[in-house]
């Protein structure tokens, strides 16, 4: 494993500025790691020529002495982000061969800050999944293993490639997106830090849409400080996205003091689930004690509508997806099915979508179309929207009562084996989002921080939920938790 590729963003920034290393050396080290890690299935489109050109430009900026924090930092980009001239398929066969003519706002801001793109990362198809098993490229694999077993484990989803690449030190950090937990759950499964910002903090323009009222881009990094640095480059108002907030972007890194004395941390009783593993329960209690020892006040809180969050999410998200995915018709871009003589436009739509969309995407399109249909709109979709408003109100009331952040588990288990859920009811897979979906429904910021290992040696994470637009405060609380937890474990290299 290259010493350079295992650097954090902050450490690499300091070495680059001190001229101890060059962006080109750092990029070459990461490209070599990517080249040797095919077994992880993390990178699906490599861009070495682009990376070298960007690194050269970064070195010139560094020499001139006015380089931003992200200058020369090699990243992986989730395949959901449109990257100009580089395949951007959302891990779906229906977008086979699609190379956008434009750059997403988030990636263009990262590149403007001098970041280097090593390539595109694996994910669940259209970000629909919790295990990276719905990808047209095949599975991404978790670099961690259970004890002495060689069972291939999931890196989580949908940002599974991002999680795997960062945990295996193939890149210094990666972009992710989070619709119901797709940054936080994989981050917890691989022992890295993942931040879902407040809805509207990062532009959605140029990110392939899943559920437009829930999707949000965020950083997946090796520690909390790196999350703060990378979020600063990703965030900001974008007139091309009507949901993007016209708010200044603070210096998130400068807010990392680690001082949380007097902060009130809420512990929601509704997150104590039946059948929750004892290890998760114990980790949660330990995390609460760590924050209390750091000077925070713990307060038991209630979020009474939590139990309705998953059903509401799995009505709203597929409904929005069925609308968004209607644009994939074989006419404008991507895959078009071969037609038989006499086939008309209806057959073209049917065959193209049958060939192009995977089973999970088809399932969600059908659920979404069903809940939006005339006879069921009020019974399902409208009711789910009302539940969403109640969930948001629960959080508003807790924050209004003086709570600064809420501590919960990030996931209901450690990483499971690839294929282990295949025979299960799809709802079993959906339960992976049980601790994370409320954050998306309420539009709040949430961060997963690695906090320990289970008895099989797999990472477990805790989640902190913050007030809207107060990512700096949330990151500082996460920083205090990270320091107290002292998580430094790395996977043993087998790939």
From Swiss-Prot:
Keywords on record: ATP-binding, Ligase, Nucleotide-binding, Protein biosynthesis
Reactions catalysed according to its record: L-glutamyl-tRNA(Gln) + L-glutamine + ATP + H2O = L-glutaminyl-tRNA(Gln) + L-glutamate + ADP + phosphate + H(+)
PROSITE patterns: AMIDASES
Entry EC number(s): 6.3.5.7
GO biological process annotation, one example: translation
Molecular function GO terms recorded: ATP binding; glutaminyl-tRNA synthase (glutamine-hydrolyzing) activity
GO cellular component, one term: glutamyl-tRNA(Gln) amidotransferase complex
Transmembrane feature ranges: none
Protein name: Glutamyl-tRNA(Gln) amidotransferase subunit A
